[in-house]
């Protein structure tokens, strides 16, 4: 039996980029304006706790231990509701954050790596290479389009 997940990754993902270029009220100056974050509250504590942890840059694998929940059961529940285990969700989340930060910011690689939850440069490089097909520095160069720099802010 193939059950369609109730929540997709794109429904749950929240970008670390919180501001975009826009105009002031008089339309005289270009300023950064806050972007509406599309944070979906599912009402399902298991999903909301995982998304909250990921948004805060924490590893959701710590949640079961802190909550006294069986890790395997929590991960299986995530898989049923989202089509992804907690590890798969965390990996995809980190990859998406890395892609956005590399494309739209000038943050040093070490800072991008930290914001993605990595302390190991080789592990971070493997994630980016596996996801995007190139190294972090190459991705930064190749993914940028004219006008990307300064388009968004954290």
What would you call each of these model-derived segments?
Residues 88-92:
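Short, basic-rich loop-to-helix N-cap that marks the start of a DNA-contacting helix
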């Amino acid at each position: 039996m193939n059950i369609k997940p109730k929540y997709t990754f794109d429904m749950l993902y929240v970008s670390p980029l919180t501001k975009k270029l826009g105009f002031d009220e008089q339309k005289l100056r270009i300023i950064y304006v806050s972007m509406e974050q599309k944070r979906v509250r599912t009402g399902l504590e298991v999903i909301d706790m995982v998304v909250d942890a990921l948004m805060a840059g924490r590893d959701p694998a710590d949640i079961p231990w802190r909550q006294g929940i069986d890790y395997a059961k929590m991960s299986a529940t995530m898989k049923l509701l989202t089509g992804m285990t907690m590890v798969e969700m965390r990996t995809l989340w980190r990859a998406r954050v890395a892609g956005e930060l590399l494309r739209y910011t000038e943050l040093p690689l070490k800072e991008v790596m930290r914001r993605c939850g990595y302390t190991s440069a080789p592990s971070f490089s493997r994630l980016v290479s596996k996801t995007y097909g190139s190294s972090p520095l190459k991705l930064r160069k190749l993914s940028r389009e004219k006008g990307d720099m300064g388009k968004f802010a954290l």
